Amino acid sequence: MSSSSRKAHFMHTNAVYWPNYRVYNGDTPGQLNYGCINRVHYAFANVTADGGVFLSDEWADAQAPCDGVQGALGSFMHLKQRYRHLQVVLSIGGGDSAETFPIVASSAVLRDNFARSARGLVEASGLNGIDIVWEYPCTPEQGRDFLALVAAIRIHLPEDRYLLTATLPAAKPVLQNIDLRQTAEYLDTLNLTAYDFFGHWSHKSGHHAQLYAMSKDETSGAAGVKDLMSSGVPGKKILLGIPLFGRSFLGVAGPGHKNRGAGGKDGSFEYNQLPRKGTKEQVDKRAVAAQCVGADGGFVTYDNPDTVKMKATFCKQKGLGGLFYWSAPSDAKDSKRSLIATGFKALHSS
């Protein structure tokens, strides 16, 4: 089946990430609304130093009771039969594989091992393909190895049968290491993580998923898209990332200020917990960012339905492929507050 015919059901891609650890929170794949989702990135599989690819949690992936079947991955494979438009790809990497990716990608033998191992896992599980999440190619040499890796994968996962995607940050120091035009030739989509621009690690508060920067020294989703497209990546291959979580800062009422640390769990709140009780939600239309401020001075920055609509409009204006969301279980259950549903409707509205 060709890449174009696989995507014929939707004019734009509306993809979600689903981390396997959410099984332990009582979340299951069957809880999602597949009327507005056409791709799931199942996260994460890990990489060994010899190039092997393996599922990271056998119980969560293949044994836990999920929607009447065994394992969250098993549930997605079952749902794929019910929703014929649904693609499920295996996201390989993340933080646990940050140290092994540079080793594997630097060797032709290990790159081939990786590609063969990934294909075996894809075929055994009935997946549509894989997503490379190397955090991150930090030098020009690693950038060249990244290109060599995706080229090696395409030999074993040909584009007429399998999806191949990669996830990269909207950060010039990373993107400038990679020949993006050549890399994009091997990919179905390049997923741009247009969030985490600010957080508990930052010296000042800021909108963590802003579409437009508020000063020259800040990055933004629009800047990341510009970097990709000016480097030769076709707009239709770019997915803009939407966070289903907010970043918090204590002791400030907005962006651009020194703060007293972070509130919430690890400095963040799941989107379905926002806006916080007792706060008023506001939208910064210039940055395209939502926020709420608590009585304790806690400033939380995130996306809401209004900002997602604006980002979807941006995608259509720039000719981008669509949106993706990290991560699906954190979305609001109310369809009017759901960012996934809002994004789908906005992408497909005239």
Predicted regions mapped to residue ranges:
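Active-site groove signature of glycoside hydrolases
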Residues: 117-143, 192, 196, 324
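Glycan-binding loop/region signatures in secreted carbohydrate-active enzymes
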Residues: 56-57, 198-200, 237-317, 333, ...
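Short, well-ordered coil/turn segments that N-cap beta-strands
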Residues: 10-12, 36, 84-88, 126-130, ...
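Conserved, mostly hydrophobic/aromatic
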Residues: 40, 90, 132, 153, ...
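Glycan-recognition patch characteristic of GH18 chitinases/ENGases
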Residues: 2-122, 338-341, 348
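Substrate-binding surface in catalytic domains of secreted glycosidases
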Residues: 15, 19, 50-70, 135-276
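Generic structural signal for well-ordered alpha-helices
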Residues: 70-77, 115-122, 143, 147-154, ...
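Short, acidic/polar
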Residues: 20-35, 106-124, 172-183, 221, ...
